[in-house]
Amino acid sequence: MPPHSLSALRQQKLRYLFRILDVNNSGRIDADDIQLFVAALAAGRNYPQDSLAFAALKRAYMYIWERLSKQIDLNKDRKVTADEWLAFFDAVVDDENFYRDFIRPIERTMVSLLDVDGDNKIRLVDYRMLARALKLSPDEVEQVFDVMDVNRNGVLAEEEAAAAIQQFFLSDDVDATGNWFFGDYRK
């Protein structure tokens, strides 16, 4: 595989996210992994699996998965390997439509999921729900939230959370707070 034009930092963050999404630790991400991830998110929100809320959550994540996997799954085996994952992000590193077409929908889904009470603010208690799916320890949850809460007001405004997600995927700045959105990417 040719060298990536992605920075070492972005490769590190993307490998970390790949490991998170490979919920069953098969070395590949497939629809089963996404469904397991959704189940963990739903459990964090106390959504019963037969609820409308669970169905909506699953629908949103499966939609993102279907869109991404069509682009990422190079050999069309309905599984995404780490090499395919990195090759995709490497190919779109300079694509100005990538943010609009792929990152923005992820931002909207994540922010709406985390904003439990609909006030356009994400609190530590809200972030803990995501942290359960990310398998973060309670200490990590507080550490990560504190890093992202730049103005130290105890909440992430919708814009702060969206900016953090964007930074996770697009920033080459080692000090960008969004690098931590999904946890300690250095693991």
Residue ranges and their predicted role:
Residues L6-L9, L57-A60, Y99-F102:
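A generic short alpha-helical patch detector that favors 3-5-residue windows
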Residues I20-D22, S26-N97, T109:
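Acidic (E/D-rich), amphipathic helical modules within compact regulatory domains
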